[in-house]
Amino acid sequence: MSGLLKRFGPKQADSVDGLEPSPQQSTISSAQAPEKTENNATISTARDIEEADANRRLATFERAHRWDPNLEDEQLHDIDDAVNARDPNSEARIFDEVFENSPYPEVRAAVRNYDEDLPCNTIRAWAIGILLTTIASGLNALFSLRSPTLTVTSVVIQLVAYPLGVGWDLIMPSGTFNTFGRKWSMKPGPFNLKEHGLIVIMANAAFGNGVGYFTDTIVAQRGFYGQNFGWGFNILLAITTQCVGFGIAGLMRRYLVEPASMIWPKTLVNTAFIYALHDHSKTDPSKSNGWSISRYRYFLYVFVGSFVWYWFPGYIAKFLSIFAFVTWIRPHNVVINQLFGGSTGLSLIPITFDWTQITGYSLYSPLIPPFFAIANTLVGTVFWYIIICTGIHYSGHWYSEYLPMSDSNSYDNTGKLYNVSKILTPEFTLDEEKYKAYSPLFLSTTFAMTYGLSFAAIAAVIFHTILFHGEEIWIHGRAVGDDLEDNHTKMMRKYKPVPWWWYGLLFLGMAGMSFATVCAWPTHLSWWALIIGLLIAVVWTIPIGIIYATTNVHLGLNVFTEYIIGYMQPGRPVIATLWSCFVQLAVMEWGLRHIPNICEQGQANNFTCPNGRVFFTASVIFGLIGPRRIFSTGSLYGGLQYFWLAGSVVPFIAYALARMFPRSKVRFFSSPLFFGGMVQLPPATPLNYLSWSLVGVVFQRIIRNRYRGWWMRFNYITSAGLDVGLTICTIIIIAALNLTGTSFPKWWGNTAPTTTMDFLDTAVQKKVSAGEIFGPPAGSWK
């Protein structure tokens, strides 16, 4: 949502696709730049500016963006050379590139740099927006219970909103109405870009990242603990957890929205797609590697192709979804299934023909993030999960020979799923005597590794932000930050901003309701613990927001907050998940009541509650048993505490190397992504991350570099078409077939892949006999 606020604001004149300047725009070449006078040179750009002022602003830009990984090397080198040489010809050219448009090719590819005065606050925009966000919020709540999860994104809403907006005038009456002194019409004119943009902003605000954390809390309570606080608690939980974040985000907009470097890559798909829907003109083949098709027609082809294709991996031939052919050959070989399996293995041959596997679990389209983000995530996945986890697992560390390689479950010392009811009191707190008599908790190798990497990422993001973004934050915190305004930000000034105190009141009001929520129900969450949770959110908003705004990779705070509260108030499982609206809640309640065998591993239509299962396991680890028993020195997973140190040290090493070699590729290394780019694993699998990374490399590196014209014109439209086709097909399959019990006739392509140890989550090297246990001797754990 935040980035999109800049996308549909006013822009200065440019071409439709942002590739070439229009005749009205004054782009100065060396020959056009005025000669430097003896005392006071003038740089003639779209507005006259003194040479000294231009040099100062470029120097400020250089300082703020010195380590910006989204700027190309040539750009930074040109700016540095021009500033040092004080050459007005070079300064004129670079000044236009940096301040009169956007210095980022991604933004120029998707956003026009001129504005049209069009109405947007219309009854049509609000009616369509509210209708579609209501429907999509419910669908996302339902799909979050499915594996792999699927998100109805705002791109889908864009497509559906377009024919509704265009057809509005055909059914609505004419006439002008007067409400509270404000005149409005049911027919405000042709459906336009800004109305469409308002609908998209509503969609991003309602379900920009799928469903809220509160849904995982409710699934963990209802689906795994059998606990239900009722509608009153659920409604307050939904409102407070969603709106507290809006208050914090609004207060931080000077640092996370206004800077040009905060590109919010996911919003670029929205803007490119809206332009494609409203502009059906053909493409200039000289600017797009020979392609002349309009973006609108191209989108339709991709959309239809994606829709038709998903019937195969999603319903007719499900073996195409996880193409782990090696496991089909040896379905009962433990090592083969651990190494090559795509469900609970490492997927060493990561092949999938299913866009859901590539974009599921909130990874989103790999055509969106910049290449450096994809590369860091790929390197992190290979290093930590393929190399390190393989070594740990086959060394027998953490008693891994008795456990799966990769899943999101917790286990006892007999290799069975951890039975939480054996250690709970009637008040849903820990019974220590029962715990000592039962079993310590064990995790799969990748699941345990994920917790260690989460520790490192939380530490790394703080130090990385201070070192690599500290100067930019400092500049924007002072009046000097205005010197960094690009054309998009400057022209947004004609719109009256929301006062900062509105966000402050929202935050304080929702914080007050949060206290009422946790104190009025038996959550066992103390008021002072809630205050600490809010403070953590405030402190980490800027670091995590900067990473998200520049990479499209979201680093969650849930592990850190669960860890802290687990130490402060151990033995209470519900509060660990509380840390982490109405429509999502209603659909969630319906699904939990009416879908047969929901949240069970073998659920017929894959409604296995993957996110809720992870939250449930986290609540057992951090809330019920407590991190002291699992991660402290001398405990089974105590070694993972060293990841805090690693996350604190690595950013300093990277920064030192970047300072020593300022024109090297070191500035593209991101320690938060190296440690935390795989934050969704589990419930995501190595297959998801590896296939996502490989597709990203193809589009964001190979095609972007070799076919820049095509990439600038069609990359984001390709992403939109694939996402929309997949989503609409999935909705039809689930609503019309899965929920009605209509299955495709059985054949090898749908049955054979489900008989492997990888799919059944039974690929373990050793099993204990009846009456035996593995791990620490009985009763020795604390």
What are these regions (language model features)?
Residues 2-782:
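Alpha-helical multipass membrane-protein architecture
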